[in-house]
Amino acid sequence: MDARIVFLLIYMCLLANNHAQITISNTNPYNSSNHLINNVLLGGGVSANNVTYQGDPIQVGFFNAINSNLGIDSGIVLSTGDIIDLDPNFFGFGNIPSSTNSDPDLLNIANSVPPLINQPFNVTGIFDVATLEFDFIPNSDTLSFKYVFGSNEYLTWINSEYNDVFGFFISGPGITGPYSSPPGFPNGSINIANVPNSIPPLPITISSVNNLLNSQYYIDNQSTFPQTISCNGFTTSFTATTVVQCGEIYHIRLALADGSDANLDSWVFLEAGSFSSNGSVSVSSGIANND
């Protein structure tokens, strides 16, 4: 065998070992939203109940990305398509989700971005919505968790109507916001998925974080070889944080959708064990089974 071919094979093996490919699962127990929240997402100092998921089952699951370039080792993934499409070893096309094509809060967020970045586009609709939501009680005065946003809309469709969008909507004591909130939380909700230190807050979409704007937070995955994850681009890991009142009940809705059409998927990756409030964890045993 040609020495150059041997060298190339060795080099590719070394790359593969240094950058392990992502693995995805939505089979038991990762097909349970209760398991994903209580056994994957929750960290210290929070208890959770009333867990619900809305969307196609193919749009949510568990990921393991240890030694990949994602920036998060493992956790929950939400997708606007079939999560299997993230696997570089999967050849073909995943199933098309049969999920809701409406979410006023996400549409409002998507269309709040253009004037904030001096762009003229307008998002005409919302498609392939996936949401995880639950009530929680924090054990301190701060809530935080880590996440990454990725999309195959990068970079072709930045600053266009195909502005895929997500939001982390939190409601509860001390919070008054413009977005919807469930019964029992009458003062609306706020979105805590924003570009760090942006004033006014700039929601994270493909048009607000990319190679041209806030580029310090953008990773171009198309130039990566070998790819550890089938995604054109993604953000660096962010920390969502907000002030809360210790011992009070709050509600959070984690939502993701395609903008203007159902083509080209986007994802939100939530780091395992990062949803925390600086205390010892006490998970409720009375969580409703709303899978």
What are these regions (language model features)?
Residues Q21-D291:
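Aromatic (Trp/Tyr/Phe) and Gly/Pro-enriched flexible surface segments
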Residues M1-S25:
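Bacterial Sec-dependent N-terminal signal peptides
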